């Protein structure tokens, strides 16, 4: 038997974006129906000052910081030789931290559960239908969810983006992959266990690592072209550097995830559907802004909800954030292109970073980290 449920607002997606949107709406007193399957959340993420400012607006900064590892620097090295290129020391007054994705999710769920106007439904949506009066979502079980407004927070390959832009407007197939692993800190050299971000630049590839879970684990992200991720890639990429030899252990489980090209949709809102998070902006991970910009989206919405009716707040959030996030997305994409330089170009890049020193790198990154959105 088909059930029909009517709600003022449905949030599609139960990941970081969906929960953040629900919290922004629920904190403003709006009844919210959060629909979707809780995603798997391995690994970690980094947060910069702009991300923490957004979390503060959502009253989430203290809870997440309690679970996070403070980072005091970014150290950049050559991946093949371990040669030190430069080091950026963070100002202690500015928060930089790393946290496990599961801890972030736990904090978001805990916050959402304190808001009585948020309800959860654990199901998979099959279809999103837009009309002039309401939006309808149909689950795989045939249940229908009708809403005055839908927040699409189900990612770049989600139904919400497809419904807003058209089924043929999905992100292009990625040419690059991120190999992600979470490893016990005790199994890695001391260099990995310091409270900092370690960026190692290679020939057509790069790796980022940082501590999470109170320093007990290290999150590693190795980015390279998809055609290089074949049998034996660990030995080829890590085997020549003694510092990285432990990473060739076949027991390490690497998650192969796509790196979609950077993209900000020009339109985030149509009819009764509004996109938020990476459904609206595909953010490369190279400046540690993926989750942070999602929190900025939600914080922007919360501020506007205190000033305007719901529909006007959604209009303004979509218009404002679709412009604001463009510069950061372009800079993240440019950083990725620099990091994945190969051959002689990669050697020239490393020489330039070494000669330019920390001031140049800090000015390049600080413009993003301190951005007032």
Specify the residue positions occupied by each region the protein language model found.
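Conserved N-terminal helical subregion
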Residues: 2-9, 24-26, 48-165, 169-184, ...
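Residues at the starts of beta-strands that form the adenosine-phosphate
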Residues: 8, 31, 217
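Conserved mid-domain beta->alpha element of the FAD-binding
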Residues: 11-27, 151-152, 209, 253-340
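Conserved Rossmann-like nucleotide-cofactor binding loop
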Residues: 17, 40, 157
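Glycine-rich FAD pyrophosphate-binding loop
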Residues: 26-43
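Conserved FAD/dinucleotide-binding core of flavoprotein oxidoreductases
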Residues: 85-105, 109, 182-256
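Histidine-centered metal-chelating micro-motifs
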Residues: 158, 178-180, 205-208, 280-281
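C-terminal auxiliary extensions adjacent to catalytic cores
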Residues: 353-373
